[in-house]
Amino acid sequence: MNHILFLLTAAFCFPSITVAKIIEAGSPDKKNVITIETDNQVSYSLSRNGTKILDTCPLSLTVGNDTWGTDKCRKITRKSVSEKVEFIVPRKYKETVDNYNQVELIYKDYKIEFRIYNDGVAYRFVSTANNKQPVKKESVSFRFGQDHTSYTLLTDQLQNWFEQDYTVKPINALPKDSFSVAPVMVEVDKYKVLLAEANLYNYPGMYLQPALESFHGIFANYPDKEVPYEGDNKIYVSTRKDYLIPTCGKRVFPWRVTGIFDNASSILQSELIYLLSEEKEQAADYTWVKPGKVLWDWWNDRNIYHINFKSGINTDTYLYLVDYAAKHHIEYVLIDEGWSARNDLLTLNPDVDIPRICEYATKKGVGIQLWSKWVNIMRQMDEAFAQFSKWGVKGVKIDFMDRNDAKMVNFYEQVAIKATQYKLLVDFHGSYPNEGMRRKYPNLMTREGVIGLEYNKWSKRATVTHDVIIPYLRMWVGPMDYTPGAMLNAHPETFYENQHEPMSQGTRSHQLAMYVVYESPLQMISDSPTKYDKNLRSFEFIKSIPTTWDETVPLEGEVGEYIALARRHNDTWYIGVINGATPRHIEIDLSFIGNGPKKIKAHIDGVNAGQQAKDSQIIEQVIKDNEKLPIDMSRGGGYTGIIHIEK
């Protein structure tokens, strides 16, 4: 990150005898206003354009026998920051501006920082003394003062896959013995309010438990006893300590974040979680990080045919995939489960010659990525990553963590550090959603934490409605490995689960639009080469879509209904529209691209796509300056347009 502009106002420091009990601060655009009260217990409330967003929300942190946030504030400082940020791995933008106002409450051994952005507010505790006591409890509340519709991912287990269905209900109608994976969305009048966390290190991740007109933070205590299960494939925490982390130390704690947006589309512009997160070390070199598309073997069950060898988990299959990737300019091939012994990454499956595959792939200009369950990485990280590097492996996909207590959060960072040392890209699956660690470690390319395409192999949960909720909620916090690319497409009445030859819900154009709409610097190409060879028109579109973006322009949409946006990579614009369950006609204003006619090549729903989901067309359109782009979509449909700007 380059710091181009930094503006720091003079800090206003007040002696403890004159410290105000009520402090008010606004966002740079003055639309968001936070009111902080310091009497007895610190609390805050929040409004936007005069509309109450959050009612009085108390906060505290229990360290040893002390409860921070309940003693006397000694001093208050304020500052304003406007700072240009350049992304090492661009997700939405090549660059943006980190612009906020900050209020800092200073106490004897700690501080509480509040930051007010144009798209939200956040606060965190900062320990300023090397406190050796355990952190026992944190009190986090988001109180709305009224009942509102919420979008939650409910569970009753601290150990889970972070892959729940969205529950859309008023807060007061939610079961109070459950809690939600973050982010949670609450609709307050016309505003979309998102609750999450940022900069999570050496601390448990936050769940959100519904209460009367509010949500409260829930955290997993530190593990005590851990036992293997599912044939040593996973580790279950059977008992936990009576604290969150064993030692407080001198440190910053995670940000508690409230994003506030005027409409659904404005969520798509926000990089708030990233901006609140710790930067990479100045000297750290990540020029080797290479985003791209990944040919993946597992989803399609290596179902390749019209070939002269037996496909499966074997060397011939992976050499074939390398050849296919090289032919079609796909950057990576992911070798999923089965290439090594079940519990030993250094003992190869005799049918899979990893050194030979890697050597061959290197000559072809293709990178190899390897899958592993996390328990093997935990046990063999040093030896395995060193060996991967010697083989020429370019990335790892690590799976089945299924928890977010502090010990597991530390594992994520240990992976990031060691993977950086050996120049390995990382894709976390069975993972909690993003919380900003990718800013400090840009080789953390993507992660799951979402119901994605894999669910179509065994369930009907990856619906077209789900597909137009997740870009507004899950994707707000960071890259999302949904793994699109299905060539067998069906509507609900003809869809069925199939492990060997899976399909997707929604139309072919619905699938293709995911490559523009869903953000993931490593983007999977999930179906088999045989399927792509039979559907070359669609495959050519997939191949032509980049995985990182210089600019993003939200166009229109509603949560659970549809999403339309434009993205630019170099001088080419891409239009992506994903539709939900209802047929839809929209008209898009393209004036943001500039003057002159726009020549568009588009992948659209065919005229019979409402009946046959595979029906699609490739068309060419020319849109003049005084015209809008008309888009007609089937139920579960989509649209992808590519606009080359002629200079």
Where are these regions (language model features)?
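Bacterial Sec-dependent N-terminal signal peptides
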Residues: 1-22
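N-terminal accessory beta-strand-rich subdomains and adjacent acidic, glycine-rich linkers
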Residues: 22-277
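Edge strands and adjacent loops of beta-rich recognition modules
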Residues: 91-97, 541-565
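An acidic-aromatic substrate-binding cleft motif
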Residues: 248-324, 328
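Aromatic- and carboxylate-enriched substrate-binding clefts and catalytic-loop regions
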Residues: 335-507
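Catalytic cores of secreted or luminal carbohydrate-active enzymes
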Residues: 509-555
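Carbohydrate-binding surface patches
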Residues: 559-595, 639-640
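C-terminal beta-strand-rich structural cap/linker in extracellular carbohydrate-active enzymes
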Residues: 620-647
